[in-house]
């Protein structure tokens, strides 16, 4: 049970899905997505917002350098580990705001098969 300011009664809090943001792969992209989610959520109080867990590991190896063959340092292992961490912390749906990180989408989807979306 929780009390929502402005409501006359206690309500049973509905079970929410939790969004996991696989971020830090360009921290500004993660920040931009988070700000857009806040700005476009029709919330009248903090509790009306989407539950979100964000990983932001800026030290992840450079995706573009790996994709272009300029680095052998594959960022996938870090992305996979962060994906599992997000799931561990309750994420039921994952989002990846970094454009170049989508190169690894198929591998992530295979590694995290129980997620509704990656």
Where are these regions (language model features)?
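Periplasmic-binding protein-like
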Residues: 22-24, 92-98
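Short Gly/Thr/Asp-enriched flexible loops that form oxyanion-binding sites at enzyme active sites
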Residues: 100-114
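N-terminal glycine-rich anion-binding loop in soluble enzyme alpha/beta folds
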Residues: 2, 10-77
């Amino acid at each position: 049970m929780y009390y929502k300011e402005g409501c006359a009664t206690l309500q049973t809090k509905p079970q929410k899905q939790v969004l996991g943001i696989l971020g830090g792969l360009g921290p500004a992209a993660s920040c931009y997505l988070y700000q857009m989610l806040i700005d476009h959520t029709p919330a009248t109080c903090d509790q009306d917002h989407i539950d979100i867990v964000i990983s932001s590991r800026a030290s992840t190896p450079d995706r573009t350098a790996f994709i272009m063959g300029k680095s052998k340092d594959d960022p996938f292992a870090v992305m996979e580990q962060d994906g599992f961490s997000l799931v561990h912390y309750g994420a039921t749906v994952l989002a990846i705001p970094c454009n170049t990180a989508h190169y690894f989408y198929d591998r992530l989807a295979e590694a995290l098969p129980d997620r509704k979306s990656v």
